[in-house]
UniProtKB/Swiss-Prot annotation:
Organism: Arabidopsis thaliana
Binding site for glutathione: 14-15, 41-42, 55-56, 68-69
Protein name: Glutathione S-transferase U27
GO molecular-function terms, A-Z: glutathione transferase activity
Any one cellular-component term (Gene Ontology): cytosol
Domain GST N-terminal: 4-84
Gene behind this protein: GSTU27
Amino acid sequence: MSEEEVVVLNFWPSMFGARVIMALEEKEIKFEYKEEDVFGQKTDLLLQSNPVNKKIPVLIHNGKPVCESNIIVEYIDEVWKDDKTLRLLPSDPYQKSQCRFWADLIDKKVFDAGRRTWTKRGKEQEEAKQEFIEILKVLERELGDKVYFGGNDNVSMVDLVLISYYPWFHTWETIGGFSVEDHTPKLMDWIRKCLTRPAISKSLPDPLKIFDRVTQIIKVHEFFYGY
């Protein structure tokens, strides 16, 4: 490989891995992709690169591993920065803190509520759906009239973090019986705008493939444990 050796360890449905790949693609950084079977036999490379958490994604840059998706995105933004390269986080300390705040909020709220729309049933599922819709409404208000969360010209880390969940929307909507567009139409416009960017559209996993995998998991769970 070239002097800049960049390797990404990932599991294809992961929203956390997707944002790392999008960050690299947005900055036009060449990298080698290595798929990990996180539910099967984890590779020695993953266990050596992330011995504490043993999780994906991992970015290996010139032999040095960087772990945790948002930390990786910030690392990418700091290492590959010049006048020609998109900046994913602002240089102003306050604006940067706000970017981190929203990225962290998305991972805490969207991930948890979305997951419970298909792992829970009855009242708990309804509560999860409402929480999911409410956090999307909060994010829609934060977006306001901007094209992207990062402004009108380019995406930011917040955009990459939130759009990384989009491939899961189909699963959550179908199983939960609701429509994101019915509740947050402007946010869906933002999603469509993001998907016009090649770096984003080619980096996201297939929503139907995710749905198939989730339904398989549900069937296995029902067979062994019931619901």
